[in-house]
Regions:
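Accessory, non-ATPase domains that flank or precede helicase/AAA+ motor cores in DNA-metabolism machines
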Residues: 1-265, 272, 277-293, 326-327, ...
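Accessory helical-bundle/CTD segments and flexible terminal tails appended to RecA-like ATPase motors
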Residues: 14, 18-40, 299, 304, ...
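Conserved nucleotide-binding/hydrolysis modules and their immediate coupling elements
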Residues: 57-60, 65, 361, 371-376, ...
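Conserved strand-helix element at the start of the C-terminal RecA-like helicase core
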Residues: 140, 155-170, 322-348, 396-407, ...
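Conserved RecA-like helicase motor-core motifs
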Residues: 156-158, 178-189, 355-358, 364-367, ...
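Flexible beta-alpha connector loops of hexameric P-loop NTPases
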Residues: 182-191, 233-244, 304-312, 395-399, ...
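Cys/His-rich Zn2+-binding cysteine-cluster or related metal-binding knuckle/ribbon modules and their
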Residues: 191-192, 203-206, 240, 245, ...
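Conserved two-lobed SF2 helicase motor
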Residues: 199-221, 434-457
């Protein structure tokens, strides 16, 4: 990893030894669980705590978080005898999953694909697979049969998920299949949990690990299969520190371990499709949804011909569809990939715009918490009552919509509907994700307004209408993957509709209904869309046909960053079939108080870009206050 991504070896080693206490001796902690006793004094908070804790066990702080009460409430339940403590060995083995606990009933297509994965797992040889199935086709059930085979062979399994929030719903599905939960690995774990997982994985006693991209670097004793779920997701690319792509590192690790690697996706990346065309990956297709469920019908709403009312963002046709859906007692999802209430706040008296002092980015209004926040560095200020430039009061205006604004509009249009917002601001932990799922399943939510977080992995049979508020949002900026990402994102969110026996409908609001990506979504012709995108990449020698590498120079001293970037550019080697562009100010010219300049290396696939850059930069020196970062195969061009 360090060699391919030109990352410091120490940084990669830090990821591998991610639990600082893992090499220490044995430890115990005290965890608490319900006794079944009813406390003499039952308050509303105590009742809520006992109900939400159920049969869970954990530290006082963990149980308080689960129950959404204070630590004092939990301590009171302990004193009242409703909760009891027990010493837990931090290194106690995890219960082993049973591969034959509850085998699923598979369709013919699923059984065929599962059989191939089981055979590949039994041979214990490296082979990469693309499990390409439409949303709702049952990809999870298929790759879990590969996991079951690894368990029968006495080996370990790793399943990577793109979001921490997906972990809790997945754990429930896994428990239903194997009788126990897998070992979870993500940034939300406390140090003691990380230590236990790390040690049990290294000993080979933790059989199945489900986690975020960092789970790739854990010390498995004998991996039998690796699965990358939602493998197209850009969140698998790490943008800070070591700039690695978990999808590609998973394939690399599978090669080292001698085990199959499954990339599961309803909308595979062009790079993955290209590997199938070259014969390097084997494709397994699931062309239809499981059971009686059908793919939803997708229709575009031309916002030029059918615009929303003034001051609103939901077009009349979508309003009518929401009304009809709610009247049938069904659920609605409104999708807008923009957190907060509005992306820009300005003064209508003097024109002042609120910009982050640390980044070249606007401050986003979050009306729920009455704050303006930068989504790049996290800088937060209270929403002011007056303009800081001209002191005018009541002159600040919110420009553009975010999910909070759409939720307000939905509430105004349908006052009897129960509206919920789902973003990383509201679903910040697996426990919060589980709470959201429970509310949806209990019909306690009528309209969900969410960002890309709701496009991944959720299954709600009563959700039959999806409205995409702004399909053009992701097409801005000139990114070479913009159209592909838009197609993937909308297809994924469309896949939330009609997953049960009730048919689903998707309405896509756009100012460009004739755009190739919108036409492909409406027609369902993914193959033609991907063929055109692939040909455009081929003509431009862009990935997967060519290579990119970004060199980002940054410093708190703008002149020092600029001078270093120019020095690097002047020293660029002359290599046939390789071009160096820049330096130029990065689109995000300042980030976290550091001024940024970018160079872009473009080469054919025959060029060993890593060797060229290693020799090039290795011969140079720059001031200590300047950082030079290399991003091989970049996904983010900011």
């Amino acid at each position: 990893t360090a060699d391919y991504y030109l990352a410091p070896l120490a940084a990669v080693l830090r990821m591998a030894l991610s639990s600082t206490s893992a090499l220490e001796g044995g430890k115990t902690i005290v965890e608490y669980r319900a006794t079944g006793e009813v406390p003499p004094r039952m308050t509303a908070q105590r009742e809520q705590a006992l109900e939400r804790i159920g049969d869970r066990q954990g530290l006082i702080r963990e149980l308080a978080t689960i129950a959404d009460v204070s630590d004092a409430v939990i301590r009171g339940l302990v004193k009242a005898g409703a909760l009891e403590g027990r010493a837990v060995d931090l290194d106690s083995p995890f219960p082993e999953p049973d591969p034959d606990h509850a085998p699923p009933v598979l369709s013919t297509e699923q059984a065929y694909a599962a059989g191939i994965l089981q055979a590949a797992t039994a041979t214990a040889e490296f082979e990469p697979f693309l499990l390409d199935g439409v949303t709702g086709s049952g990809k999870t059930e298929v790759y879990l049969e590969g996991v079951a085979e690894a368990l029968r062979e006495g080996r370990q399994a790793l399943i990577l998920l793109p979001e921490i929030a997906l972990t809790e719903p997945f754990l429930k599905r896994f428990h239903a299949r194997f009788g126990v939960e897998p070992v979870a690995w993500h940034s939300g774990l406390r140090q003691a949990q990380r230590r236990r997982a790390w040690r049990q994985i290294a000993a080979g006693q933790a059989k199945v690990v489900v986690g975020a991209r960092s789970a790739l670097f854990l010390p498995y004793r004998d991996l039998g299969i690796i699965v990358v779920d939602e493998a197209h997701e850009t969140s698998f690319k790490q943008e800070d520190g070591v700039h690695y792509h978990a999808r590609d590192v998973a394939v690399m690790r599978g090669h080292f371990e001698g085990c199959p690697v499954v990339l599961a996706s309803a909308t595979p990346a062009i790079e993955t499709r290209h590997q199938v065309e070259l014969g390097r990956y084997r494709e397994l297709k699931l062309p239809g949804r499981y059971g009686k469920a059908e793919l939803p019908a997708i229709e575009a709403i031309d916002l030029l011909a059918d615009p929303p009312e003034r001051g609103r963002w939901i077009a009349p046709k979508l309003v009518g569809a929401i009304d009809a859906t709610l009247a049938r007692g069904e659920q609605v999802l409104l999708f807008l990939n923009r957190r907060g209430y509005a992306p820009l706040t300005l003064c209508r008296t003097c024109g002042h715009r609120f910009q982050c002092p640390n980044c070249t980015a606007w401050m986003v209004e979050h009306r729920l918490i009455r704050r303006l926040a930068c989504h790049h560095c996290g800088h937060v200020i209270p929403t002011p009552r007056a303009c800081p430039e001209c002191d005018a009061e009541d002159s600040l205006v919110a420009c553009g919509p975010g999910v909070e604004r759409i939720a307000d509009e939905a509430t105004a249009l349908f006052p009897d509907a129960k509206v919920a917002i789902v973003t990383s601001d509201t679903i910040w932990s697996p426990a919060k994700a589980a709470e959201f799922v429970a509310r949806m399943e209990a019909q306690a939510i009528d309209i969900v307004v969410g960002t890309q977080l709701v496009t991944k992995g959720y299954h709600f049979p009563n959700l039959t209408l999806v409205g995409v508020i702004d399909a053009d949002l992701g097409l801005e900026g000139g990114d070479l993957r913009a159209a592909e990402r838009t197609f993937q994102q909308i297809m994924q969110v469309a896949g939330r509709a009609g997953r049960g026996e009730k048919p689903g409908t998707v309405l896509v609001q756009t100012h460009a209904p004739g755009a190739r990506v919108i036409e492909a979504l409406v027609s369902g012709d993914a193959e033609s869309f991907y063929a055109a995108e692939t040909e455009a990449r081929r003509d431009a020698d862009a990935p997967p046909f060519g290579r990119f590498a970004a060199i980002v120079v940054s410093s708190e001293d703008k002149d020092a960053a600029h001078d270093t970037a120019r020095t690097i550019a002047r020293a660029a080697p002359r290599v046939e079939n390789m071009d160096v562009f820049g330096p130029a100010p990065a689109p995000l010219a300042m980030l976290r108080g550091r001024h940024r300049f970018r160079l872009l290396v473009h080469a054919t696939r025959q060029i060993d870009v890593q060797d060229v850059i290693r020799d090039w930069l290795g011969a140079l020196e720059w001031p200590a206050k300047v950082r030079v970062a290399v991003d091989v195969d970049p996904y983010n061009f900011l």
